[in-house]
Design a protein with these regions (language model features):
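Conserved Class I S-adenosyl-L-methionine
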Residues: 155-168
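Conserved SAM/SAH-binding beta-strand->alpha-helix loop
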Residues: 67
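Active-site phosphate/pyrophosphate- and oxyanion-stabilizing loops and adjacent acidic/basic residues
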Residues: 28, 152, 156
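Active-site segment flanking the S-adenosylmethionine/decSAM binding pocket
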Residues: 37, 41-45, 88-152
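Glycine-rich, phosphate-binding/catalytic loops in enzymes
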Residues: 55-56, 80, 129-133, 156-157
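S-adenosyl-L-methionine
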Residues: 1-64, 72-77, 83-86, 101-108, ...
Length: 208
């Protein structure tokens, strides 16, 4: 993946992305699932959308991103990596317009959905949405919320249709990155830092 110099989201985690540490368990999960279609909800600057196309993890990606600057960066980065013809960049998505923004004949059994919408997941994944995408693999970043019932309620909804496994991304393996071996612990960990205020948590939903 060739990265665009113009970054609108997460400038502090560039080193982590360059060395392959950034959300590396999610990278591996996408590779393991290996569905031909990726729907990236909250695509930001396109690390996963374009990275998955460039590495041939998927064949086509629908990237939803509400921020205009990020959509512009997505387009530029897609051209830099020569995958612009395999990418559809779409604006803000809600539970009400989601299906209208996708091809009507999309086969959701061939789809992986990756969702990172800063807490909006608790509202977006309604029972109607989940029932329609029940044959997809879904990876949702679960954000902290003061109302614990939101996470409990979402878990109850998804368990109707999916088996749920929890991914905690809190370990980075430096073994294969020899240029980091001589650094002290602080500098080495700063390089792989994603700047989080708490350990990241995702749910992987696999069809029952």
């Amino acid at each position: 993946l060739k990265m665009n110099h113009e970054i609108s989201w997460g400038r502090g985690d560039i080193a982590s992305k360059i060395y392959g540490f950034y959300e590396n368990k999610i990278q591996q999960k996408l590779k393991d699932i290996n569905n031909p279609i990726l729907i990236d909800i909250g695509a930001a600057d396109g690390f996963f959308a374009i990275g998955s196309l460039k590495s041939k993890i998927c064949e086509f990606c629908y990237a939803f991103e509400e921020t205009k600057k990020s959509r512009e960066n997505l387009s530029k980065t897609a051209k830099i990596n020569n995958v612009q013809n395999k990418l559809s960049i779409i604006g803000k998505v809600t539970k009400d317009n989601f299906f209208t923004l996708l091809p009507s004949k999309i086969n959701f059994s061939e789809v992986t959905i990756l969702c990172d919408i800063e807490g909006g997941e608790f509202d977006f994944f309604s029972d109607e949405i989940l029932a329609t995408i029940r044959y997809s693999n879904i990876i949702i970043e679960i954000h902290k919320n003061h109302n614990k019932n939101l996470e409990i309620d979402l878990l109850e909804r998804v368990k109707k249709y999916f088996d749920v496994s929890i991914i905690i991304d809190n370990d980075k393996n430096f073994e294969s990155v020899s240029e980091l071996h001589a650094l002290n612990d602080i500098d080495r960990n700063l390089i792989c830092s994603e700047g989080r205020s708490y350990i990241g948590k995702w749910w992987h939903l696999s069809p029952k």
